[in-house]
């Protein structure tokens, strides 16, 4: 057990934590510092030649650019374009017109629509947009953000068309379909429980005498809706993950959940059994035609059709596009990895195509589309730099042996109890960076090597990192700031953190139990 090597290997990670949390540096600056430190340490302590450091870095940069950065920019561009064309306003109006019960509205907006936004775009949109919608409907600001934080955690490993799962699978050499499936098995209890928690938070209101509704009163009339909302979400997502992959798991899951929740909500409204204290006065929006509704959803419908039509479910198309790919080895040292660049059949390409066509359907001119694309690239440049730096750092640390030093020390100290710590490690990554993708890039290799040392499934251990991300994301300072900014509130970060922290801590305890009890499952 080399304590010195362990401590030195942690320096790039500690740097990132300290710079982000203590000195409030932007993520891209802190990530560059971590990358530079990893290169210096790899050369000075692990004696990795300069050429190998350079090629390891280049491998990380290329992996970040294609497909991760491509998908990120494409997804956010699609969202930005829908905002500029007014499509997002139409979609929001459609969802909020379904019910006037605050508990059901929270499910529809934060859980179903928020899950859809996470699957399609991610990067804060799934907290900011639903939180703003809830506040606009009359929810108090901090509870509105709290509801969206609770809703946003569990779908995060499949955000931005599955990028967190796809990227960590590529990094550690695992099959993305199998990894996505194992992750969903681990996350399933939280998918089912979270809508119930959302209902409890949304229903925490007082009557005219100041008496707060009890737990039973808050659940009355909507508990079944919440339960089925969660079950339908994870059930549909699991099927998609098993047969299509992580890219559409949360997208399809959220759509199925939205359709079922909307139907059940309308039925509950008509029953007349909903408690009047949870009623909200909502102004009726303009009557929408089928044409305007389809136009508003066109970008997302096209993304769904294109990704599904080019997946393994359509072997003829999938096989025809497979040759349009390049396989290269960049690292010049021992045991280099192989990078695969799919030039056509990659989610980013299809998302861009869907956005261009959908934007035209929504009435966007080529000039407007170009303006939105340019603005999106500029908007996402800090994220691009962060991804390049984090992937470069991860590759240098991996090839130099720094990851091995960290995992060897953790195994020596924790032994067979290491799986208990695995979700907490993933949570720390998400808490610090505010990103499920970055957490996987930082700690995915550590989890994989720990699995090999313990003789347990790589898939189970790497999936535990994503499990922890679900809890860490909801307490990340970046996520809190995005949510509060969306409801135009300042100085409430501590109050919001205090409200969400017990939920995250409770989740992590349950995650550790799942980590230990489930490692023997035949997955």
Question: What do these predicted regions represent?
Answer:
Residues 1-5, 24-30, 54-66, 178-185, ...:
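Interfacial loop-to-helix junctions that mark the boundaries of transmembrane helices
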Residues 157, 161-278, 469-523:
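Juxtamembrane and boundary regions of transmembrane helices in multi-pass small-molecule transporters
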Residues 54-137, 146, 363-450:
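Membrane-embedded alpha-helical segments and adjacent helix-loop junctions characteristic
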Residues 1-11, 64-68, 121-126, 179-193, ...:
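Structural signature of hydrophobic alpha-helical transmembrane segments
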Residues 253, 280-426:
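Transmembrane helical segments that form the transport core of multi-pass membrane transport proteins
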Residues 4-6, 16-52, 74-85, 261-272, ...:
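Structural signal for alpha-helical transmembrane segments and their membrane-water exit/capping regions
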Residues 25, 84-87, 100-101, 134-144, ...:
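Juxtamembrane helix-boundary/capping and inter-helix hinge elements in multi-pass membrane proteins
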Residues 103-115, 140-154, 175-195, 199, ...:
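Alpha-helical transmembrane segments of multi-pass membrane proteins
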């Amino acid at each position: 057990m080399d304590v010195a090597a362990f401590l030195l290997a942690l320096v790039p990670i500690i740097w990132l934590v300290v710079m982000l949390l203590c000195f409030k540096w932007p993520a891209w600056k802190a990530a560059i510092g971590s990358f530079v430190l990893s290169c210096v340490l790899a050369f000075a302590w692990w004696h990795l030649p300069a050429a190998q450091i350079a090629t390891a870095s280049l491998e990380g940069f290329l992996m970040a650019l294609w497909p991760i950065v491509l998908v990120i920019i494409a997804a956010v561009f699609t969202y930005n374009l829908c905002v500029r064309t007014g499509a997002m306003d139409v979609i929001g109006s459609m969802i909020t017109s379904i019910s006037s019960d605050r508990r059901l509205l929270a499910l529809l907006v934060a859980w179903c629509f928020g899950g859809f936004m996470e699957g399609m775009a991610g990067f804060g949109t799934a907290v900011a947009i639903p939180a703003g919608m809830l506040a606009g409907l009359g929810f108090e600001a901090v509870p509105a953000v709290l509801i969206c934080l609770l809703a946003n955690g569990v779908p995060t490993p499949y955000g931005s068309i599955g990028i967190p799962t796809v990227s960590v699978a590529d990094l550690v050499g695992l099959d993305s379909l199998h990894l996505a499936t194992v992750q969903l098995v681990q996350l399933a209890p939280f998918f089912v429980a979270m809508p119930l928690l959302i209902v409890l938070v949304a229903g925490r209101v007082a009557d005219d005498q100041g008496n707060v509704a009890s737990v039973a009163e808050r659940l009355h009339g909507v508990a079944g809706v919440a339960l089925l909302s969660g079950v339908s979400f994870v059930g549909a997502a699991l099927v998609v993950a098993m047969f299509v992959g992580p890219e559409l798991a949360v997208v399809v899951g959220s759509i199925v959940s939205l359709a079922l929740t909307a139907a059940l909500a309308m039925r509950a409204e008509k029953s007349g059994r909903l408690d009047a204290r949870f009623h909200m006065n909502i102004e009726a929006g303009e009557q929408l035609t089928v044409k305007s509704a389809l136009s508003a959803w066109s970008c997302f419908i096209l993304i769904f059709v294109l990704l599904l039509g080019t997946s393994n479910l359509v072997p003829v198309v999938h096989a025809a596009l497979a040759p349009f790919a390049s396989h290269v080895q960049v690292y010049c040292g021992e045991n280099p990895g192989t990078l695969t660049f799919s030039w056509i059949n990659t989610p980013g390409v299809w998302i861009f195509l869907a956005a261009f066509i959908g934007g035209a359907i929504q009435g966007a001119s080529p000039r407007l589309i170009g303006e939105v694309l340019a603005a999106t690239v500029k908007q996402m440049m800090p994220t691009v730099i962060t991804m390049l730096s984090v992937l470069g750092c991860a590759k240098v640390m991996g090839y130099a042996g720094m990851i091995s030093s960290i995992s060897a020390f953790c195994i020596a100290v924790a032994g067979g109890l290491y799986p208990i710590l695995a979700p907490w490690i993933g949570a720390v990554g998400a808490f610090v960076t505010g990103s499920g993708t970055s957490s996987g890039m930082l700690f995915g290799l550590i989890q994989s090597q720990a699995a090999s040392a313990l003789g347990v499934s790589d898939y189970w251990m790497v999936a535990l990192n994503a499990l922890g991300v679900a809890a860490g994301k909801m307490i990340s300072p970046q996520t809190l700031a995005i949510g509060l900014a969306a409801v135009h509130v300042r100085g409430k970060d501590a109050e919001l953190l205090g409200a969400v922290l017990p939920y995250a801590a409770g989740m992590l305890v349950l995650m550790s139990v799942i980590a230990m009890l489930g490692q023997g499952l035949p997955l």
